[in-house]
A protein has these predicted regions:
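Nucleotidyltransferase catalytic core that binds NTPs
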Residues: 1-149
Length: 149
C-alpha cells in the first residue's frame, strides 16, 4: 500500500510507486491511495483534479510495464483503508513515516496485525534538498529535481 496526492507526479513519487510494485511481486497487489479533491484541497498550492492525477498514475504504471495488479482507491483522510484493510506492507518516505507508525498503532487498537513499513529515501534535487510538490509549484525545481532559478 502507498498513498499520496501525487501532484505533480515527480521522481520521488515514482521511486515510492516503483518500490511498491517491486515489493508486491508478480503475485501481489498494490493499493494506491490517491487523495480526493476535497482532502487535497488542504494543500497550500493548487492541486489538479482526482481524475487528472489518477490518469498520470495509470500512465506511469503502464509506461513502466509493471505486471503486478493494482487498485487506485480514493483517500479521504491520512489513513484511508490502511487501518482496517488486509495487506502486508506500506511504503513510505522519510516524510510520511510518522503516518505509517500511526497506522500500525490504529491497527493494533483494532486487533489487526501490524504491517511491515518499508521506508525509501527521499529523492534529492540538484541542490541537495528533497524533491517536493511544493518546491515544484513554487518554481524552484522541476519534477526531476533540476533547479530552475
Amino acid at each position: 500500500m502507498v498513498g499520496g496526492t501525487f501532484d505533480p507526479l515527480h521522481d520521488g513519487h515514482k521511486r515510492l510507486i516503483s518500490r511498491s510494485f517491486a515489493l508486491a511481486g508478480a503475485d501481489g497487489q498494490v493499493v494506491i491511495g490517491l487523495t480526493t479533491d476535497t482532502f487535497a484541497s488542504r494543500k497550500v498550492h493548487p492541486i489538479r483534479t482526482f481524475d487528472e492525477r489518477k490518469t498520470d498514475l495509470v500512465n506511469y504504471i503502464r509506461k513502466n510495464a509493471f505486471t503486478t495488479s493494482y487498485y487506485i482507491e480514493p483517500l479521504n483522510d491520512r489513513f484511508g483503508s490502511a487501518a482496517d484493510a488486509e495487506f502486508d506492507a506500506i511504503v513510505v518516505s522519510e516524510e510520511t513515516l510518522p503516518t505509517a507508525v500511526e497506522i500500525n498503532r490504529l491497527r493494533k487498537e483494532k486487533g489487526k496485525r501490524k504491517v511491515d513499513i518499508h521506508q525509501i529515501s527521499c529523492v534529492l534535487a540538484e541542490d541537495g534538498r528533497w524533491i517536493s510538490s511544493t518546491r515544484i509549484y513554487k518554481g524552484e525545481i522541476d519534477i526531476h529535481g533540476h533547479v530552475l532559478h
